[in-house]
Structure formats: structure tokens, C-alpha cells
Amino acid sequence: MNSFSNLPAENLTIAVNMTKTLPTAVMHGFNSTNDPPSMSITRLFPALLECFGIVLCGYIAGRANVITSTQAKGLGNFVSRFALPALLFKNMVVLNFSNVDWSFLYSILIAKASVFFIVCVLTLLVASPDSRFSKAGLFPIFATQSNDFALGYPIVEALYQTTYPEYLQYIYLVAPISLMMLNPIGFIFCEIQKWKDTQNASQNKIKIVGLGLLRVLQNPIVFMVFIGIAFNFILDRKVPVYVENFLDGLGNSFSGSALFYLGLTMVGKIKRLKKSAFVVLILLITAKLLVLPLLCREMVELLDKGDSVVNHTSLSNYAFLYGVFPVAPGVAIFATQFNMEVEIITSGMVISTFVSAPIMYVSAWLLTFPTMDPKPLAYAIQNVSFDISIVSLISLIWSQAILLLSKKYKQLPHMLTTNLLIAQSIVCAGMMIWNFVKEKNFVGQILVFVLLYSSLYSTYLWTGLLAISLFLLKKRERVQIPVGIIIISGWGIPALLVGVLLITGKHSGDSIDSAFFYGKEQMITTAVTLFCSILIAGISLMCMNRTAQAGSYEGFDQSQSHKVVEPGNTAFEEGPAPVNEPELFTSSIPETSCCSCSMGNGELHCPSIEPIANTSTSEPVIPSFEKNNHCVSRCNSQSCILAQEEEQYLQSGDQQLTRHVLLCLLLIIGLFANLSSCLWWLFNQEPGRLYVELQFFCAVFNFGQGFISFGIFGLDKHLIILPFKRRLEFLWNNKETAENRDSPVSEEIKMTCQQFIHYHRDLCIRNIVKERRCGAKTSAGTFCGCDLVNWLIEVGLASDRGEAVIYGDRLVQGGVIQHITNEYEFRDEYLFYRFLQKSPEQSPPVINANTLQQERYKEIEHSSPPSHSPKT
């Protein structure tokens, strides 16, 4: 809804092509006056791509196990204890306090304190007594502490380096406000919660307050700010040359490494979210990204009494932009240290970072408008829509490739989600084409309008149709759902509406705005479509909520039907929640004779039989590996039951109901904004600046829905990241294919395999290997990849699931274990692997086993290893 046709009559002539007729003054900053622009908006988009591109690289490195969570801690320590303190120290030393606008700092402090205490009080009133104080301590910190240095500073530098370079120094002054004045209050609440949980009567009130203040003083950022201010006066704002080069070397490494580390910390944070967590996250993110920016801006407008009107306006805009910065990773560190509200805080950090990018982009565009002239506004919305459509289309292509390659599009509700993604893709393509259609090409405009608005109305309707299908899935389990009717409705009704609009509507010839191409009739049609979709989606989700027990939504990583962890979304966690092995793979076996695989065409094949759902014994059995070693060494995927069940597991996967519910909730928010825009235009003749902001939000939502879909469905590592990693390794190292492991392996892999065979292999076999049926009357000793990962962590051979996967992959490369069909590398999933027979040439090294680990083995032998959720 990019319409400004309701502005005063003298400004209604927007028929000209904005890209050709706008003057230069409008093109640069959209400033109709002769004043210079307050910020360099042309550098914003590249800065956002730079920052979030590095974050994405870090995420891919963590998801692909190039850097494990344990290894990432070293990078985090370097960033927080060396790079950032050096950067802070130098900038505090050279800071010119005479140029600081202290009223700006007071305004930010009041705004942050207001949000902090509002969130704190509401949490104390609403939260359950069991965890009231921990929530009241961490949630306000979440809502007020921004990622000032890693994400904020590069963006401020891009916007204000050429116009107001002194604004960069405010980052170093504003950041300690939260750390020194507000965070101690939150820490004290957390210490009170810890005291209540432990019932430690000896811990008095003074000690609790002291511990809270001590945590603040231990923060390197706070410590270095005080040291830097002291040396500011001692050195007279001049850093010695021999020290300056050293500080520059550390400080210059901060930005890239901090953003990369941020991506690493985002891996697997969205996990096992319950229904109640959705509400909490939405409220916290709203407080951080919407309430705080507005309060910061209003406080500066109210308290700043600067002489320059331009500087006053620019400061208030800067305050708003500062408030939009996402949550700092340090909040997640605080939650982990206290072991309180970790899931909500870490998940919120990821979501706020993801959501803040489009908000910062739109906010910066809005802040460049000194007047309400409709021409530059319409031009800006056209360009924002075009830019977002390009990136969104790429995200949608990625997400659709995930659904196609995983074959989830064949099952519900992913079949309907695929239609939604296709409609969103057509919307982006239509917007891109609309941008190039000439004003006088009426036929071209009509054709593109039909393409654009048929698909846009389809995205509106698919939100409601997807919600009602989720309700039917939840209500009727696997009962047949009228998929054909839903698909026909999702595409047919929008096409019918656009057809009626073409026949009955009157073309508004003086507008190039697609949202007002057919004037009032189009706005009414859009409003009715939005209202119906919101009504259907809202009723469906409420009914779905009533039919489900409180908190019974499955986690992001758990399947409702199989209780299997969904591939690609489990965190590197030290103590994951227990998940049972799929029922597909468990039962008793009446006969456990050696597999009677026969040799044919150079390959071993198990006898062809009808599929049997249950294949393994309920108790671990020590198989005769020398006897059936060749069993399933090259099982045919069309005849072996284990291979068939693997394929069924990989294809069926998870219905991902929680992800679809979250998708519907986020889309409903955008539908409400569009409906508000339509109603505002129909009933209000004086739109004002808030209406303009709403128009920008609607444009970003309509053509940026791909970001939401990508964030929810586009991050499957096994279909995109790992294949790319394997291909890159193949090209880099010129390796053989996975089936040919005859090439020499590295000495490190040899040593790992020899140590495992000599000290750990037999115990591992006794603990995790089970007899599983692979033929009519045959069985083989196999184990699941996730079971080996759990065992490696249990005995201390790996510190986390990421390192365990690397260890298992070394065993595969060294020929110690092998996938039953040799199709997959080692994965932390319910895929079947087997131990290969010991090679005579493999002599164990002379290494003394650790006594403590041997004692640990004795304990493990008397107890079965716990079942952990796989890291996939």
C-alpha cells in the first residue's frame, strides 16, 4: 500500500516517473531545502550488507562445524577481553568532552531507565513466583542493552562519518549507561533468585548487592572506560605513538571478529520454544525495537535545548536509530552465567538481530525526510520496495530449494507453505518488473499489475488458509484435509478479485503507484481481503490453542509424530533434553542370525522382503562382528530395511507445526499494518508523518516476506551448507569421492583411529551397538550416529556435539566405522552406522590411558548412556 494520493490536492500529481524527473536535491537525502542532508543514506545499504554478511559467514561456519561452540569461546574471549577493551581505551583517551551534548546522554539514560523499570515492574506483577526475580532481572537488561559496538558502530559510521563525525563518540559514552547504571539492578534480582532457589540463609542483603556490583566491575568494558577517562586527562587526549599502533592493531580487529562471533553464537539458539515463550519474545522484542527507539527520540526532542534546529533534529533522529540496534550478545552470556531464562534470552537475541535489519533500513530512510512532499516520499518507497524485492527474492529461492531438496513439499503443511513461498516470489518479481515499466505503457502496466496484485492478494489469503490447515492438522491428526480446495482457493480467489477489479474499477491515470492503480475500489478490495484473512487466521490459531494443552507445542527441534529432532536446528548444547529413539527403529527380533547378504555384481545385497517397521532389539546386544562383518557393507537402498527406514526418516521429517504457527503470527502482524493503512486512507484526509511511516512498513512487509520465510525454513544445514562444504573440500584438496576412501589419510586421523580402536572401541560396542533386522531373517550390529555422539560426550572424548561430529567423521575417514550404505558422511542423526573389522596393519600406539577416564568407563559399563537429542 504505497499510496500518497490522499495528500492535499496541489500535491496529487505524481504521474511523472520519479526516477527521471526528481531534482538532484531530492535524489540526495530527499531534502527539498538547501540544507545538507543529516546522514549519508547512500552508504546505509552497503553497511548493512557488510555487517549482516559477516554475521552470516559466522553462522555458516558454526552450523557446518568448521568452528565448534568450544572453539568459538576462544574467539569470544579475544573479542571481549582484548579487541574491545583496546578500542574503548583509545577512543576514551582521545575523546573531547567539551564537544559532548550532555543533554543527549541524559535523554538516552532516562529513556533506557524508563523501559527498564516498566519491563521490570510488569514482569514482577505477571511472572510466576517460582522464577519471578530471574525474569525481572534479565528481561529488562534484554530490553535496554544494545549491540553498540559490533553492529551499531559500523552503521553509525556509515551514516554520519561525512556529516556528523562527532556522533561516533556517543557510542562509547552511551554504552556504559546500561552496563554501570541499569545492569546492576538486574544482577541483584538474579542474585535474589539464586538465593531463593538455594535457600542460603547466610547470604545477607549486603552480600547480594555486593555480588551484583562485583559483576559490573568485572566487566572489561566498564573497567576500561574508567581507565580511559583517567588517561584522557593524564595524557591530554593524546595517545603515544608506540602505544597507538598497538591499540590500533587490536582495535581494528574488533569489528570483523565481533560480527563473525555473533554469527557463531546464533547457531542453534532457537530450540524447544514453548507456546508461552512466543508471547514473551514478542513483547520483549517490541519493547526493545519499537518502544525504546520512540522513547529515545521523544526524550531528546523534549530535553535537548540546542541552539541549532538542524543539530537538534539530527540528534533526535540519531537517538531513534540508536534505539533500534539489536540486543547485545552479552545478555545471553549473563543468562548462561546465572543459568536462568537461557532459552528465551538466546532465542530473543537471534530474532531481534534478524528483525532489526529491515527496521534500521526503513528508519534511516524515514529520518531523511524534512518535509511531507509526496514526490520524494513516493520515490523513496519505490526504491525501498525494489531493493528489498531483490534480496527477498534470493531468500525465497533459497527457501524453496530447501523444501524441494528435502521433499517436504510432498507433505502437509509444507505443501501449502510451498504455495505461499511461490506467491511471495511472484510478488517480488512483479515489483521488480513494475519498477521498469514505463509510465505511458498502459498495456504493460495492466499486465504487470495483474501479476503483482494477484500474487500479493494470494500471499494475504495463504496466511489464513495456512492457519486453518494447521488447525485441521492439530485437530484431526492425519485425517485427510481438502488440499485441492485450499490450493484452488489460494490462487483462484485472488485472480477472481483482480479480474473483477479490472472490469469494474476505474484506472487512476495520474498515478504510477501500484497500490492506488485503481483508486478507491482497489483500496476497498484490499481491505476486505486483509480482513477476511486476518479473521480466518485468528480464529484458526485461537481454536488450535484451545484444542492443545498449555505448553504442548513441540519444540522447534522436535517432531510431534516421531519425537525425533528435526535436522539442522539443534544447538551445540552440553545437556540437551532426552529424546527417545524413533519408534520406527525399535522392537524385538525373534531371530538374530547372521545377515545372509549375497554377492552380486561386485556388491552385497540383502534379500528383498516387505518393509517391516520395527527393526531393533529393545536391549543392546553384543554382535559377532567377525561373523557378519560384511553384512550391509554395501546394502542396496531398495532392498535393505534399514536403508528404507533411513530414507523414510529423511523424507518425512517433521511437520514443524511450531514454525508454521510462528510464520502465521508474523504474517498476521504485517496484515494488520496493511489493513490499518487502507482504513487510514479511506477515512482520514490528513495522513501525517505516522501514516508515512506506516506506508514504509507496509512496503517492507509486502516485498520483504521472503526474509521471514527464509528465517524460519531456509536454514537447513544438511541440504545447503554441508554439501557446499564437501564440494569445497573436494575442490580444495582434490579428494576422491565418498565411496573411495583408499587415499592416504592424515597422521592426525590415523592417531585418532588407533587410539579409539585400542582404548575405546570395545566399550563403545557394548554400550551403543544393537542388533537390527536388515532382512527377513537376518540382522546386523548397527548404531545411530546420534548415539555415538552422546557416547563420545559422556566418556569425555568430545566436549560438545560439534566436536563429537568431527571425531565421528575422523572415524569414518579412518575406516573404523561406516554408514550402512556408504551414502552419508557422519551425521548427528538417526542414521545407521556399523563398525568395520579391525585391520591387521592397525597397531595401537604405545599410549598410557588416563586413569580417571578408565574409572569413568567402569561407571559407564554399569549404566547405559543417556539418550540425548542429536545435533543435526
Curated annotation (Swiss-Prot):
It is a multi-pass membrane protein. Pfam families: DEP (PF00610), Mem_trans (PF03547). Residues 759-837 form the DEP domain. It comes from the Eukaryota. Disulfide bonds: none annotated. It is found in: Lysosome membrane. The keyword Amino-acid biosynthesis does not apply. InterPro entries: DEP_dom, GPR155_DEP, Mem_transp_PIN-like, mTOR-Rac_regulators, WH-like_DNA-bd_sf, WH_DNA-bd_sf. GO terms for biological process: cellular response to amino acid starvation; cellular response to cholesterol; intracellular signal transduction; negative regulation of BMP signaling pathway; positive regulation of TORC1 signaling; transmembrane transport. Glycans are attached at residues 11, 17, 31, 311, 383. Residues 1-40, 103-106, 157-169, 237-245, 297-317, 370-383, 438-440, 504-522, 684-693 are lumenal. Cholesterol binds at residues 45, 59, 268-270, 659. Residues 382-719 are annotated as: GPCR. Residues 3-372 are annotated as: PIN-like transporter. Keywords: Glycoprotein, Lipid-binding, Lysosome, Membrane, Transmembrane, Transmembrane helix. Its main location: membrane. GO terms for molecular function: cholesterol binding. Cholesterol-binding protein that acts as a regulator of mTORC1 signaling pathway. Acts as a sensor of cholesterol to signal cholesterol sufficiency to mTORC1: in presence of cholesterol, binds cholesterol, leading to disruption of the interaction between the GATOR1 and KICSTOR complexes and promotion of mTORC1 signaling. Upon cholesterol starvation, GPR155/LYCHOS is unable to perturb the association between GATOR1 and KICSTOR, leading to mTORC1 signaling inhibition. Binds indole-3-acetic acid and may play a role in tryptophan metabolism. Cholesterol binds at the interface between the PIN-like transporter region and the GPCR domain; these two regions likely coordinate to sense cholesterol and regulate mTORC1 activation. This is Lysosomal cholesterol signaling protein. It comes from Pongo abelii.
